[in-house]
Amino acid sequence: MNAPLIWAGLPVFFGVVLWLIKKYPRIQLLVGIGLYALFALLAIFLPIENPLGTQQAGFIIDSSLNILGRQFVLTFAEQPVLMLLFGFSAFWMLGLFSQSHAIRLIPYGLVILGLLTASLMVQPFLYAALIIEAAVLISVPLLADPASRSSRGLVRFIIFLSLAVPFTLLAGWAANLAEANPANGMFQIRAAILLALGFSFMLGVFPLFTWMPMLSEETHPYVSGFLLNLLSVVILFLGVRFLNTYGWLRTMAGVPNALQIAGGFMVLSAGLWAGFDRKLIRLPAYLNVLQNGLALVALSLRGDSPLVLFSALLIPRLVMTAYLCLALSVLAHRPVLEKGAFAAYPFAAVMVLVSIFSMAGFPLLAGFPSMLLLLERLGQQAPATLALVALGLIALIGAGIRHMISMVSPPADLEMQGLAVEPASGLLLNVYFTAGILVCLIIGLFPSRIMPAAEEIVRAFQNWR
C-alpha cells in the first residue's frame, strides 16, 4: 500500500462506485460523507514511511508510486494539506442534507478531489496541468444544468482552464532548462512569464475572471461554489509548490511586485464588481476572485511567515464560503432572491451578510485576524498595494450594506404572490446557520487557535525563505 493510492486512487474509485448507486440518494449521501471524513481522518492519523503494527504483522505505507514512468510522491509533511482539502469537502457535503438537487456533487466531488490531490503529488510538476484539465472535463456533467437556457459560463470555464494547460506545461519545461543553464537568464524570464500566464487563466487574474460570475449564475450555487473554491485552493498550493521547488524564481527581481500588483487589482476589481452587481447569486464568484488576490498578495510579502499568513487566510475563507453558498441555495428557492429575505428566511439572510462582512475583514468576525495581519504587513512593505486592497475591501463592505438594505425591504405585491412557493428553512438549517455564526465569532475572537493549524498546513514547503 502507498500514500498516493490511498488519497488519490481510492477517492476516484469510490466516486465511480457512488455514481453507480445514484438511484439510492440517501445511501449515496451518507456513505459519501463518511468517505470524505474517513480520508480526512486518515490524513491526520495514518503515518507515511513509518511502520504500523508489530514487527511480525506490520507494514509500511510508501510515499511514492510510479505510473507510466511518472512518479507520484506524498510525504508525511504534506498530510495537513490533504486534511484541509478532505476536511473542507466533508464539511461542505454536510449541507447536502437540505440540498437534494445538488446531491450529484457527492460522487463527482470524490473523483475531482482525487484528481486534484494527484496533481499535487505528480513529479515532474508540469504534468499537474494535465491532471487538472482532466478534473475540469469531468466536472462538466456536474455543472451542466439541462434546465438552464444559457451555458456561456460553462463554455468559458472550459476554454479558460484549457488555455492555461499549454502555458503551465511550457513553464515547467522552461524552469527545468533554467535550472540546467543557470547562467542564461533568458530561460528564467521565459519560465516566469509562462507561469504567470498559466496561473492567470486558472486563478482569474484581472481581467480573466468573467467566466466565474457567469458560471455561478448558471449553475446551482452549492455546486459551483464548491468547485470554484476547491480548484482555486489546489491551484494556489500548486503555485506555492512551484515557487518552493524553484527558489530562484521566488527571489527573481520583479516577481514579488508582480504578485502584489496582480493580487491588488484582483481584490480591487472583485470588490468593485461585487459592489455594483445587483445579482446576489454571483457573489461567491467575486469573493473567490478577491480571496485569490489576497492569497497572491500574502505570498509576495517578505519575512519569515508569508506562508503562514497565506494558510491563515484559507481557513476562514473555506468555512465562510460553505455557509454562504448554502444560504444562497436556500434563498434561491424564492422567486426574488433578495427582497424580503429577512422575513422569509431570517437565518439564511443573516448568514449571507455575516459571510460577506467576514471575508471583508470586519472586526470580530472570522476573517478579521488574518486580514489585520495582512494589512499591517502591507503598510510596512507595499503602501500602494495596501491602497488597492483597502479600496476593494471597502467596496465589498458597501456591497454587504446594499444587500442588507435590499433584504430588509419588503417585496412588491407581485413578488409576494410567489413568496411561499417553498416552505421556510427547517430546524436543521437554522441550527446549522446558528452554528456557523458562532464559529465565525469564535475564530474572530480567538485567532490563536487557528495559527498552529495554519503553520502545520504549510510545513511541507521547507525551502521557502
Task: Walk through the language-model features, giving the residues of each.
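Transmembrane helix-loop-helix hairpins at membrane boundaries of multipass inner-membrane proteins
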Residues: M1-A8, F13-F97, I106-P107, E455-A460
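Short helix-boundary/re-entrant hairpin motifs in multi-pass inner-membrane proteins
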Residues: S63, L195-A262, A285
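Short aromatic-rich membrane-water interface segments that cap or initiate transmembrane helices
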Residues: D62-P80, Q188-A192, G379-T385, R465
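Helix-loop-helix module between adjacent transmembrane segments
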Residues: I67-Y127, A144-S148, R152, S232-I235, ...
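Predominantly late transmembrane helices and immediately cytosolic-facing juxtamembrane segments
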Residues: P213, A312-V336, A349, A384-A424
